[in-house]
Amino acid sequence: MIRTPRISILVTGVLTDSSIAFHVAKIAQQEGAQVVLTGFGRMSLVERIAQRLPDPPPVLELDVTDTGQLDSLAGRVSAHTSRLHGVVHGVAFAPQSALGGNFLNTRWEDVATAVQVSAYSLKALAIAALPLMGSGGAIVGLDFDASVAWPAYDWMGVAKAGLESCARYLARDLGPRGIRVNLVAAGPLRTMAAKSIPGFAEFEGLWPDRAPLGWDITDPQPAARACVALLSDWFPATTGEIVHADGGVHAVGG
């Protein structure tokens, strides 16, 4: 058991109780951590979902493309905790035109949106949280393997490659402050975000058969547990890493 007593964690990206971020928050609370959530757009939905956690946490609004909200984040979080020991980046988005086999025809404006929300926001969130992190802590982002070109994933795959590179540079620059930056690359899960990806059914059908350990597309717990482990002090010398929680598919290829 990994205990995380007396630590405070900011979790972004919770939309439904099927999301990895929700289960990160749930497991972290079960292990003793204090949690603060952020939501965007559908705040009433996020607030309702927060009530399903063991200890319903505060929910703050955060649009990662809004510099005003980012600049005020530390102040708003400080109303609930004076220190952040961990941050979970669970934010990703790409316009429909950037997915589903339209790679060659996607406009730059839509590509820019995917990259800003899904990759650059890791750096933006880290900078926003730094005033409360002091010396030491962990930032963990949610990833999907960007080492190959997946069917239909298109510009979101490019954005995830950017996320992976961004995490390495953050690990370099935040390491002197004792802050670890890692990613968890999960296998496909039947979340609200995944359902919006054209061609997602291809992942659903193939992944369980290809995974040496098997894979349950309805169970976010393996990925969430990996996140909580990285948020804890059990990985004090690990940074700039991508931990694959995908049943082993990344290791065996097609």
Q: What are these model-predicted stretches?
A:
Residues 2-37:
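Canonical Rossmann dinucleotide-binding motif of NAD(H)/NADP(H)-dependent dehydrogenases/reductases
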Residues 13-24, 93-127, 135-176, 188-190:
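Catalytic loop of short-chain dehydrogenase/reductase
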Residues 60-71, 75-78, 86-112, 131, ...:
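Conserved mid-core segment of classical short-chain dehydrogenase/reductases
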Residues 88, 92, 140, 244:
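N-terminal Rossmann-like NAD(P) cofactor-binding module of classical short-chain dehydrogenase/reductase
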Residues 164-167, 171-193, 235-245:
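Conserved Rossmann-fold SDR core element
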